[in-house]
Amino acid sequence: QYVSPGFIDIHVHGGGGHDFMDGTVEAFLGVAETHARYGTTAMVPTTLTSTNEELMTTFAVYQKAKSLNKKGGQFIGLHLEGPYFSPKQCGAQDPNHLKTPHPDEYNTILEASQDIVRWSIAPELAGAIELGEKLNSCHILPSIAHTDAIYEEVVKAYEAGYTHITHLYSAMSTITRRNAYRYAGVVEAAYLIDDMTVEIIADG
């Protein structure tokens, strides 16, 4: 047998037959207790691209579940995954809810929850750099995800505070040919930018 510190899961959508987007306290507690049985003592519940109404429900339920969570891995903040993603790299995200960042919308979201600690975004979208700067001013981590950005766009994003990459290799650009030229993508940028941190889905 082994004794070790508890795991901290920084990107988790559910567990034990529950999803955080179910929008119920029971789902949140069920996920927390399931993961605790396997050694996770803290986690960052992660959303999916959805309607703003569903997002607001998640914010309210998170607060209730956090106060009631006595047996499971503790909730240490929310990770918003979407809706500001590239349609070309949407992966498992609902393409019907993808959009570009607009200050009126994301400021409303930020005002609605003080629990957001990370927001995954495609940095090449119009308005994404400004959003990254806003998140940094709020001490929220902007993270690169579901993106078709080229290397130069990633560098610009990094300079604006996007210092992390969500599930590297999954739903993101690599070397592509555009007209007569080849461009490095997010995968290459992850290796070339020394201080960029990355997240890997270890089970494939």
Outline where the language-model segments fall.
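Active-site mouth loops of central-metabolism enzymes
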Residues: 14-26, 92-99, 141-145
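A glycine-rich helix N-cap at a beta->alpha junction
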Residues: 61-73
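Histidine/acidic residue-rich metal-binding segments in metalloenzymes
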Residues: 65-67, 99-200
